[in-house]
């Protein structure tokens, strides 16, 4: 799989830190190293042209754009530089900007007439180059502000999500899936993005694609007849092959495999726990408290016995409460969801927002929402949960912001873990009961323990 060939001048080189020591001999080197003073001298005093390429066919505006010098780019445009000038590979300055993700330079170029959909000899657009180099913020910027086509194919039929999967940039994949990029598209080799992620052994990229995808992406074969799992196994990526094989098994058409890997995995142990509580309660009442063949229980024994029954009934009440909403985040289309604009990311100031921490994993490509901090997507419930801890099989529900305190009574490991707080928690339950339980205090206890 070929990659875009763009020469990069190191931004942390000694020459760039001290332009006076750089070998600045013409307008091209002046633009590459950001020596604005010498550039003006070459142009205004020596009469050098900014519209002609160097010996390799590269333009001054490309070098300035690559190394993120927006003031020099603006100067070049004002002095005859062509924003759409192309080199021997038909790449424009915008292609070079995408390598470094220089948003400020991209704005200068695009506001001065640069074509956002310009293609090179390989059919790469700026969105393809940004995906190849993992420039997620840059990609989102040109899509939101300049309506760049994030799903356009190159000459080999590969869209930006193919390149992001091949290079293993999971955040870029999340953004593209969040914007409804087609993850089932096959290129000329018959490969989907999942095929390329499996070939390179990128576990996180495969995980994002599988959780946001369907059975079809797991089972589709390339032109050689291989599925993503088979390609991962053939390349020696055992962890990826195992993950994809398990995902295939969960979607198996065989009724037994589908039952155990699919339905039972979703249902969990909740029916077993529910039936156990009911059966033990009935047996206790019939065999001990109301047994006709046993001596009549004393008042003290009866008090403790019915207290045990009350605890059992209370457990059923809490079991019912655990089956409720654990703190699901509202999705587009849900009742109570407010969407002020067509683009969800337009509502967020990426530089100054209590909700945004600069982590693109906050985007959920499945639920199409921007998650708050500490929220995660549950692949079993297929919902995003606020303050997600884990999916508990004993209650067949997630443990999140709302249910973290109640889950304590159904998880033996958590009960041992929180032994020092046992008396305090029981006291709080006796005083406030479940409906008025202070969730914030319980959550803090859960975290501290």
Task: Give, region by region, the residue ranges found by the protein language model.
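Ankyrin repeat boundary/linker residues
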Residues: 20, 54, 87, 120, ...
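Ankyrin-repeat inter-repeat connecting loop/turn
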Residues: 49-50, 83, 116, 150, ...
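Membrane-associated feature with strongest affinity for ZDHHC
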Residues: 245, 249-375, 382-391, 395-449
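Conserved ankyrin/ankyrin-like repeat signature
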Residues: 38, 71-72, 104-105, 137-138, ...
């Amino acid at each position: 799989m070929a990659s875009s060939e763009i020469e990069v001048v190191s931004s942390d080189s000694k020459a760039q830190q001290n332009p006076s020591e750089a070998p600045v001999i013409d307008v091209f080197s002046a633009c590459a190293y950001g020596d604005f003073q010498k550039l003006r001298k070459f142009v205004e005093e020596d009469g050098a042209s900014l519209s002609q390429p160097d010996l390799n066919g590269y333009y001054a505006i490309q070098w300035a754009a690559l190394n993120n010098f927006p003031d020099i780019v603006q100067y070049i445009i004002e002095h005859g530089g062509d924003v759409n000038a192309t080199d021997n590979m038909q790449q424009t300055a915008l292609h070079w900007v995408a390598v470094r993700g220089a948003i400020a330079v991209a704005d200068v170029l695009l506001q001065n007439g640069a074509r956002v959909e310009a293609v090179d000899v390989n059919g790469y657009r700026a969105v393809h180059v940004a995906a190849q180099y993992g420039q997620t913020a840059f990609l989102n910027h040109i899509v939101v502000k300049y309506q760049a086509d994030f799903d356009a194919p190159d000459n080999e039929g590969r869209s930006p999500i193919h390149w992001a999967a091949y290079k293993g940039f999971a955040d870029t994949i999340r953004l593209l899936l969040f914007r409804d990029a087609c993850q089932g598209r096959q290129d000329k080799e018959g490969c989907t993005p999942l095929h390329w992620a499996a070939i390179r052994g990128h576990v996180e990229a495969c995980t994002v694609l599988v959780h946001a995808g369907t059975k079809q992406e797991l089972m589709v074969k390339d032109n050689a007849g291989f599925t993503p799992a088979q390609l991962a196994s053939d390349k020696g990526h055992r962890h990826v092959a195992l993950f994809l094989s398990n995902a295939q098994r969960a979607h198996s058409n065989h009724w037994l495999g589908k039952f155990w890997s699919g339905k039972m995995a979703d249902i969990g142990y909740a029916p077993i726990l529910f039936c156990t509580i009911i059966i033990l309660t009935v047996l206790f009442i019939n065999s001990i408290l109301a047994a006709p063949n046993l001596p009549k229980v004393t008042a003290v024994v009866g008090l403790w016995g019915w207290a045990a029954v009350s605890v059992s009934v209370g457990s059923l009440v809490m079991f019912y409460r655990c089956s409720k909403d654990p703190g699901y985040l509202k999705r587009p289309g849900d009742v109570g969801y407010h969407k002020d604009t067509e683009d969800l990311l337009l509502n967020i100031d990426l530089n100054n927002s209590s909700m945004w921490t600069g982590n693109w994993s906050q985007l959920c490509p499945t639920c199409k929402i921007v998650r708050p901090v500490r929220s995660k997507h549950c692949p079993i419930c297929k919902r995003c949960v606020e303050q997600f801890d884990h999916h508990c099989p004993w209650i067949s529900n997630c443990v999140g912001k709302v249910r973290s305190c109640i889950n304590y009574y159904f998880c033996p490991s958590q009960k041992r873990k929180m032994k020092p707080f046992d008396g305090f928690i029981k006291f709080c339950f006796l005083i406030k009961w479940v409906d008025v339980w202070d969730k914030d205090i319980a959550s803090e206890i859960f975290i501290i323990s």
